[in-house]
Amino acid sequence: MKRKITEQLVAWKNRPGHKPLILQGARQVGKSYILEKFGEEHYKNYVRVSLDLVPDVRNFLKENINPLEVIAYLESLYNVRITPHDTLIILDEIQDCKRALLALKYFQEEYPQYDIVAAGSLLGVAVNKGEKEQEEDESTSIVEKEAEEDFSYPVGKVDELTLYPMDFEEFLWATNNDVLAEEIREHYKTNEGLAESVHKMALDLYQKYLVVGGMPESVKIFVETHSFIECRSVQQTILNGYDSDMGKYAKPATTVKIKACWNSIPAQLAKENKKFQYKLAKKGGTAKIFGEAINWLILSGTVLKCKLVSHGNIPLTAYEDDSDFKIYLSDVGLLGAKAQMPIPMLLNAVETDNTFLGAVAENYVAQTLRANGIDLRYWKNDNTAELEFVIQDGMSVIPVEVKKGTKVKAISMNTFVQEYKSPIAYRISSKNFGLGNGIKSIPLYAAFCIEVE
């Protein structure tokens, strides 16, 4: 399946002086598949090392991370010739081998001509865990501390990319709707409404996407079988895998807290005020108790954090309130499965009167913006005005209102525009494209068109 990140991988390959690349992303977003395809299509050959499955490689790296000796060992083990620039070396699940992470540093410093890509689903979690344990254990000897430092992140020695679930445009490509995707982009530029029949077709596909989501295996099953039930089965398997990771990559006491926060997300999003409240994870819960658990979920890539900003001035980062935030799932399809949303309700999300469907639309927009590299922030003032998202685009701050259907209101948006003199405002809803009174109407299915400088 065609993925947008391929263009970024090709750009990395062609950039002079590129460093070893770390590709991060939640489990099951397609990292291994896309890297193998990249190796097949853009190199003479490639070698993929699954560090979670090949103990021989891990044992070798414990004793030796000299780049040339690592190359010789991999050539012997996989019976393949590794040539600078012509061979892609893929180190998969690098979070399971801290010495492989350290090796990237030496490749960059001593033999940068070798093209290496490391993929890690829980790398941020693993590195954070190693650093935290090192800080807590004051009795650790100097020799042991030096060994533990092997799991430090090679800052400045690697390039980085993140792969997210497939967005709606990639879903359109996978379902042979490339022409529709192009038409949506064209009308986003012109602000002219699509023909009503095309608009309805696009909304229908959007509603299907709410069920299928963007996890590649779910999309693949849908393309092959058109069975939403099969998609739900795949999603449940992925959710079960996430639960297992919580036990594997965290201490037992922390695991309990992680799962409490994770399981509270549907209830958090069901509230009119979607601010994350620790008390919904456990009665009497506080940031001190659950802060580490939330951080684990964010680092794992399974959730997205949307921070409050109390002002609409540039730079928005200066006005973030890190204690006030919303939490979304990284994939809207997984949200539907986790919340046990009836499939028929999602397939008619635009017309169905249901409060949680508003949260589903909001989650969909959040993951779409994040996949486009946009930081997630929302705004509210001291009164009752609140906007689902605010986006910094160059020298402008753009307010974004999200509605699941055609019933829209502009009270909060007008308040923001008047106070901060925004040149344009975005309203994302089931309405067709349009532009009037400084408000750009963006259909839900066109959220993938929103990009920033």
Regions found by a protein language model. Give the residues of each.
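Pre-Walker A adenine-sensing motif
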Residues: 2-16
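Conserved lysine of the Walker
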Residues: 31
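Hydrophobic positions on the alpha1 helix immediately C-terminal to the Walker A/P-loop
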Residues: 34, 38
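Short glycine-rich substrate-engagement loop in P-loop NTPases that contacts/grips substrate
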Residues: 53-84
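Structural recognition of the conserved hydrophobic beta-strand(s) that form the central parallel beta-sheet
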Residues: 90, 115-121, 162, 171
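Interdomain motor-coupling "hinge/lid" segment immediately C-terminal to the ATP-binding subdomain
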Residues: 127-270
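Accessory nucleic acid-recognition modules appended to NTPase machines
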Residues: 219-387, 391
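Conserved catalytic cores of phosphodiester-cleaving nucleases, focusing on short active-site segments
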Residues: 365, 369, 387-406, 425
